[in-house]
Amino acid sequence: MRAGCGALAALALALTGFSLPSLGQAGPVVQVDFSNPGLSPSHWTLIIHPDGSAHFHSERGNAPSATPQNSDSIRLVVPDQDRDLRLSAQFARHVFEAARNDKWFNVKCESHRKVAFQGWKRLSYSGPEGQGSCEFNYSNDEEIEALGDSMVSVANTILEGARLEMLLQHDRLGLDQEIEYIVEAQGEGRVQQICAIRGILARLADDPGVMERVRKRARLLLEKKEE
């Protein structure tokens, strides 16, 4: 599931916690929790509201530390993240439509098929209609599987944005390889909702202190419309 970023609305709402009951008091939310101890971050949470305001929290886990000076920029380990962000209203609408179509996630979504482990994805809904959640590595439900893939791609976007911020501060030459990777990943669908990192892309596009090729690619990402 891919949706365009559209025009940015007001700044994302500040969130005070991650438990569904407390968030439910402020309106319906969809939350996805991802965990895979073999990856960095090993765990992340993405909370989405119907208007596209969202919050992302990640924990690096036991991955070895890395810095821009001694690491391949594409594999640069990102420190724990805790940030508000803005997704498109169209994307948020698709997310909540999927939740409604799948009984607010009150379904069995794990296929139990012998497939490669990609990471546990727990989809949860809390709102006026009630609460529900389901967890899976791979789901036979095409809509749930696609939603899980989209959430992972959005998380990838947020983490790539964090890498750009680190490289801008510590290793500007590394920006060239990193932003080339993002352009390629977007074309393949491995990153979605570029509007989530609009801030750092705009900084790169306007910064005369970075390579012109980096600035050009940042502008390309800002201008390209996702479908």
Residue spans of the language-model regions?
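Acidic/histidine-rich, surface-exposed loop or edge segments in extracytoplasmic proteins
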Residues: 56-83, 182, 199-200
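Short, well-ordered, aromatic-rich surface patches in folded extracellular/luminal domains
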Residues: 20-38, 105-227
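A short, structured loop/turn motif at beta-sheet edges
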Residues: 48-51, 85-94, 125-131
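Charged, amphipathic alpha-helical segments
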Residues: 88-112
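Bacterial N-terminal signal peptides
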Residues: 6-17
